[in-house]
UniProtKB/Swiss-Prot annotation:
Protein name: Phenylalanine--tRNA ligase alpha subunit
Compartment(s) of residence: Cytoplasm
Enzyme class: ligase
GO biological process, one term: phenylalanyl-tRNA aminoacylation
Lineage, opening ranks: Bacteria, Pseudomonadati, Pseudomonadota, Gammaproteobacteria, Enterobacterales
CDD domains linked: PheRS_alpha_core
Organism of provenance: Buchnera aphidicola subsp. Schizaphis graminum (strain Sg)
GO cellular component, one term: cytoplasm
Domain of life assignment: Bacteria
Family: Belongs to the class-II aminoacyl-tRNA synthetase family. Phe-tRNA synthetase alpha subunit type 1 subfamily.
Alphabetical UniProt keywords: Aminoacyl-tRNA synthetase, ATP-binding, Cytoplasm, Ligase, Magnesium, Metal-binding, Nucleotide-binding, Protein biosynthesis
Amino acid sequence: MLILQKLFDSVKIEIKNSHTIDKLDHIRIKYLGKKGIFSNLIKDLKNFSLEERKKYFIIFNEIKKKTINQINKKKIELNKIILDKQIEKEKIDVSLPGRRIKNGVIHPINHTITYIKNFFSKLGFESISGFEIEDEYHNFDALNIPKDHPARNIHDTFWFDENRLLRTQTSSMQIRIMKKEKPPIRLIFPGKVYRNDYDSTHTPMFHQVEGLIVEKNINFSNLKWIIYNFLRNFFHKDIAIRFRPSYFPFTTPSAEVDVVTNNGKLLEVLGCGMVHPSVLKNVNIDSNFYSACAFGIGIERITMLRYGISDLRSFFENDIRFIKQFKHI
């Protein structure tokens, strides 16, 4: 019986001198584990008489229970010390001023798209988003773009398979809308388009806004008036504009629109024209009763001109210093 008491005294000293949870676990396993000291003491009972065994068991269980309580008590104490240290480490002085929340800045591309939406809404245009993954029919066939056209080449277009691709122009939305809606139609389609090109004036992904009007008696003069007014409003000045005859498979006549830059050079900013009768036929609109005009604006290009940005790639490099320049636009 004296052995048990000495054992408990030894346990108490070890528990008292343990300063970590790991050390305490080691003590627990040493004394209370399956192969621990208390388990081994049970084996000695075979040498005791029945009466001695009863007395031994009473003291044994009492000592074992005290040992468990001592270990649990010490564990609570050590956990409290750990928690106190953690709280002290993470202590916050509420009297200190808080960190200032920095305001975000609208990206110049988003700002331009918003400006365009607001301008054309005043002329009765609605804005609709479209699919960025298109099929060959809506992106090419229905827009009167033949099979041998260079734009359909794998070097210029991102193809998923023989039929699906990343749209190369927002014009594909013209087909989808004209199939569903009956004239009169006045819509713009802002969105991303994709072409396999990358340099200071081209990126594989860029933004366009397509405009479409389908009405009776709409003509090229109406289209010119809209474009003149938009560009002069956008650049906030009576900017010199040139309509240059061009070719697009889906419009006839077609034109590219150039503006005079600050250094006196002409720069193309958009394409436009009267929607080709074949395109109207593809969407079951009778070109004898209705005419249609369309225009496509390159968002990055007019934004570069407006704010004097020299490299198109700056829009997509995520340089916060670049974005901050447009804080007050």
